[in-house]
Amino acid sequence: MPKLQGFEFWSRTLRGARHVVAPMVDQSELAWRLLSRRHGAQLCYTPMLHAQVFVRDANYRKENLYCEVCPEDRPLIVQFCANDPEVFVQAALLAQDYCDAIDLNLGCPQMIAKRGHYGAFLQDEWDLLQRMILLAHEKLSVPVTCKIRVFPEIDKTVRYAQMLEKAGCQLLTVHGRTKEQKGPLSGAASWEHIKAVRKAVAIPVFANGNIQCLQDVERCLRDTGVQGVMSAEGNLHNPALFEGRSPAVWELAEEYLDIVREHPCPLSYVRAHLFKLWHHTLQVHQELREELAKVKTLEGIAAVSQELKLRCQEEISRQEGAKPTGDLPFHWICQPYIRPGPREGSKEKAGARSKRALEEEEGGTEVLSKNKQKKQLRNPHKTFDPSLKPKYAKCDQCGNPKGNRCVFSLCRGCCKKRASKETADCPGHGLLFKTKLEKSLAWKEAQPELQEPQPAAPGTPGGFSEVMGSALA
């Protein structure tokens, strides 16, 4: 069967998918993809896989792809990060039988991508990207796609997209933020950039960014003219986003845990998903956050989920008919998380610094930060009052705390240098240079003297050759 391209690939292989779950490291595993598909997702991506590791490590291939596929999980696109055309194609050839397309990650803005020289940090190396896409387009039996971030300039972003299309990219996902927009500096994604790309290329385009609810999806499709909309963080906080529903947080948690029992994944993935899904509820029930962080088994997590459900249902029964106050709805329903801006973040950090200063000045559990109060619950015998902590005198030579029982009144490092130089002992630091030297000398004196070999007497056989000569004679 000939390889489908462009709009034919999107309409037939991807079945005209409009609702797309993004590739998310340690978060878009099989169990989560299946949950998302049950609630309106029409296309999913695997987590980003490292092409070089995928080529050399059979266990990595098995754990991250070969054992992570099933018939219900289609259509599926496998995403790789890579910076070498040959390695990218080798990895893609090993993966192409398990998916419907191969995606090249050109959008990751994280520091690990900068150190590894991949993701959004390749967006200025157009010659390299052309070679990677062209070779993959020639060698693979499935289409190659790309996920990119925009440049600040719309015209440069358009030329970038056209270059990838010309090289052989069959579908483009455009995240409407630059690589500098991340974390507290994320800001809003530019749909204007996405719209300009869509008008300039003749392949399908997916939009990514600013998607928190179904109304955002519909507005993005209308305003940009793209073929589909991809959600990442919005999907993590509400997997039913594409259905336009906001179900109770425990409902989706229970459904997800049932899928995990059938399709196991690392417990760290499960815990991370529930922290996102329950984000607003855990602000109210902090002790359940502690429990979720501590449990070591899937059944332990299920028990925390059941406890959360009971508490929320009890709260609902007490507030029968009540309406939510403020802009946020009830905490027990799935809802977006609005990331605080840089100003809000700096205020929070300033508040944390002032709290620590207050603790240092006054001490006592009544003024401890929430984090230290949690630590005190875990370590009840540990003191957090600065006034009760032991005070250490400083070493005269380096300023580090000196040993209380050091014979030289120095820290261990300085004491070791001095004791070695003077062949002295410091029992306080366990340094016994003098004692060890004395024991060594005493041992040598106690050994019998080595006997010098005596010359043979005249007329007696002298050595091996002489004795053998006599015997032969």
UniProtKB/Swiss-Prot annotation:
Cofactor(s) needed: FMN
Keywords for the protein's UniProt record, in alphabetical order: Cytoplasm, Flavoprotein, FMN, NAD, NADP, Nucleus, Oxidoreductase, tRNA processing
Cross-referenced InterPro entries: Aldolase_TIM, DUS-like_FMN-bd, tRNA_hU_synthase_CS
Gene Ontology CC terms: cytoplasm; nucleus
Positions of the UniProt region annotated as Disordered: 339-386, 444-473
Bias kind Basic residues: ranges: 371-381
Chain sites annotated for binding FMN: P23, M24, V25, Q79, K147, H175, N208, G209, N210, A232, E233
EC number(s) recorded for this UniProt protein: 1.3.1.88
Basic and acidic residues: bias regions: 341-351
Compartment(s): Cytoplasm; Nucleus
Catalytic center residues: C108 (proton donor)
Entry GO MF terms: flavin adenine dinucleotide binding; tRNA dihydrouridine synthase activity; tRNA-dihydrouridine16 synthase activity; tRNA-dihydrouridine17 synthase activity
Principal location class: cytoplasm
Result when mutating C108A: Abolishes cell growth
Gene Ontology biological process terms in this record: tRNA dihydrouridine synthesis
Protein's job: Catalyzes the synthesis of dihydrouridine, a modified base found in the D-loop of most tRNAs. Specifically modifies U16 and U17 in cytoplasmic tRNAs. Affects the level of some mature tRNA and thereby the total cellular translation.
PANTHER family, A to Z: TRNA-DIHYDROURIDINE SYNTHASE, TRNA-DIHYDROURIDINE(16_17) SYNTHASE [NAD(P)(+)]-LIKE
Family, similarity comment: Belongs to the Dus family. Dus1 subfamily.
Protein name per its UniProtKB record: tRNA-dihydrouridine(16/17) synthase [NAD(P)(+)]-like
